[in-house]
């Protein structure tokens, strides 16, 4: 009987972990671009006036410049302060091109608002620029 209980608990824990993992990704999300251009402002979150500056502006320069920047308002994942500093692996659904980005801001477009440099690296066929947005998948990853 004790063995059955342990198996039930293990099964429950595995299912919960899978549910959490599934909630940390989304498909066919709209991604627009924003002119953060962090390389022009020494990756200064305060100068960029981004939401996450309150918590992350004093992080080391290497941390701030390691990944491209994005605003996050996607349909799945943490919001507000809980999303700040987290990383996403973003995939252009049209080309398969991938980039890892760091969340530094919020948005209201229901998806991502990528730094223009990241957007351009993902937009390898130029269709996103023509449309003004990309269709992407994203998943939260460790930074």
UniProtKB/Swiss-Prot annotation:
The keyword Phosphoprotein does not apply. PROSITE patterns: BARWIN_1, BARWIN_2, BARWIN_3. It is found in: Secreted, Cell wall. The keyword Metal-binding does not apply. Gene3D superfamilies: RlpA-like domain (2.40.40.10). One of its GO terms (cellular component) is extracellular region. Coiled coil: none annotated. GO terms for biological process: defense response to bacterium; defense response to fungus. This is Pathogenesis-related protein P2.
């Amino acid at each position: 009987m004790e063995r059955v209980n342990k198996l039930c608990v293990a099964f429950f824990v595995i299912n919960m972990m899978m549910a959490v993992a599934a909630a940390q990704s989304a498909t066919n999300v709209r991604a627009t671009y924003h002119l953060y251009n962090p390389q022009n402002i020494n990756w200064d979150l305060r100068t960029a006036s981004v939401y996450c500056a309150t918590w992350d502006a004093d992080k080391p320069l290497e941390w701030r410049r390691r990944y491209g920047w994005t605003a996050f308002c996607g349909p799945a994942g943490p919001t507000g302060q809980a999303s700040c500093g987290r990383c996403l692996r973003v995939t252009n659904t049209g080309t398969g091109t991938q980039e890892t980005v760091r969340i530094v801001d919020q948005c209201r477009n229901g998806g991502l608002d990528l730094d223009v440099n990241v957007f351009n690296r993902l937009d390898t066929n130029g269709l996103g620029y023509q449309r003004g947005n990309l269709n992407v998948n994203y998943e939260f990853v460790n930074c």
